[in-house]
A protein has these predicted regions:
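Eukaryotic intrinsically disordered, low-complexity regulatory linkers and tails enriched in Ser/Thr/Pro
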Residues: 1-87
Length: 87
């Protein structure tokens, strides 16, 4: 499993999603180039400098998202699961 931060543009605002994918960085970029939606699983978020599981913030939703490739402005890969990396 690989971990990524994906920044998207929605109108004037931008948002960042962080989660895992079975795809490599190269495969992910290729999927975006082909206009395919990107799936991130095991979503996490940053709270006061600490990475936390999505479920601790919102238990109503499945911690997974499909991202429209037309909205993606940046993709960055984590070295490992961000919950295990030192600050």
């Amino acid at each position: 499993m690989n971990w990524f931060k994906i920044k998207v543009q929605q109108g004037k605002d931008d948002y960042t999603y962080a989660g895992s994918s079975s795809l490599s960085l190269e495969q992910l970029v290729d999927e975006v180039a082909q206009g395919k939606f990107i799936r991130l699983e095991n979503l996490v978020y940053l709270d006061r400098g600490e990475i936390k599981d999505w479920n601790t913030w919102d238990t109503r939703e499945v911690p997974m998202v499909y991202i429209n490739p037309e909205m993606i402005i940046a993709i960055q890969q984590f070295k490992a699961d961000p919950r295990t990396l030192p600050r």
